[in-house]
């Protein structure tokens, strides 16, 4: 079993030194989608840039995610797929993470659900054509999908994927396309300290 780490960045990740023990592990495959690939200078990131890219901007990154999933899915050894931002750093050893992921059913995915706010529903969901056809869930933008769920996602019709490509902050909703299936645990695979960010913003 190998774990695909899907890096979605502007260019270089912020703290590459924390990833040294991870990137050398034989049970990892790395895939990078950078908005500015020519600015990527970290050797292991440059080596693992995917060939096809999508235009991205804040709140519009789902197409890039799908390209990462599609590229990583081509390797049949990849069983788990974890989305990573440029600000992420490992907080557990890879061995601990690997044991944790192996301890569950191979089909299990980990997606942390969030509450859909009134703003989400009125300004993000209802502004999209044919929104009534989808049973929405909201979730953290970083998660871990199993190969089973990645295949289900990639098999969705183009118009269903396009809906989330065009949706503002669609990266927090597009797992709605697979939410009806089994083997999904409401669990956060990453830790986001938004309270610290809020404090910093208030100080500016």
What do the PLM-derived regions correspond to, one by one?
Residues 1-204:
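ER/Golgi luminal nucleotide-sugar-dependent glycosyltransferases, focusing on the catalytic module
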């Amino acid at each position: 079993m190998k774990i695909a780490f899907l890096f979605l960045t502007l260019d270089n990740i912020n703290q590459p030194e924390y990833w040294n023990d991870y990137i050398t592990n034989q049970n990892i495959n790395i895939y990078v989608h950078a908005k500015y690939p020519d600015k990527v200078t970290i050797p292991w990131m440059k080596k693992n840039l995917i060939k096809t890219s999508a235009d991205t901007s804040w709140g519009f990154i789902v197409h890039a995610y799908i390209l990462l999933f599609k590229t990583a899915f081509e390797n049949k050894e990849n069983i788990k797929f974890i989305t990573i931002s440029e600000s992420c750093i490992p907080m557990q050893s890879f061995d601990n993470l690997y044991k944790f992921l192996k301890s569950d059913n191979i089909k299990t995915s980990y997606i942390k659900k969030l509450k859909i706010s009134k703003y989400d529903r009125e300004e993000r969901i209802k502004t999209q054509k044919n929104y009534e056809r989808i049973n929405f869930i909201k979730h953290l933008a970083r998660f871990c999908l199993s190969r089973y769920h990645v295949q289900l996602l990639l098999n969705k019709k183009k118009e269903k994927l396009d809906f989330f490509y065009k949706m503002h902050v669609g990266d927090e909703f597009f797992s709605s396309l697979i939410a009806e299936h089994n083997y999904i645990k409401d669990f956060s695979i990453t830790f986001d300290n938004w309270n610290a960010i809020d404090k910093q913003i208030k100080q500016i």
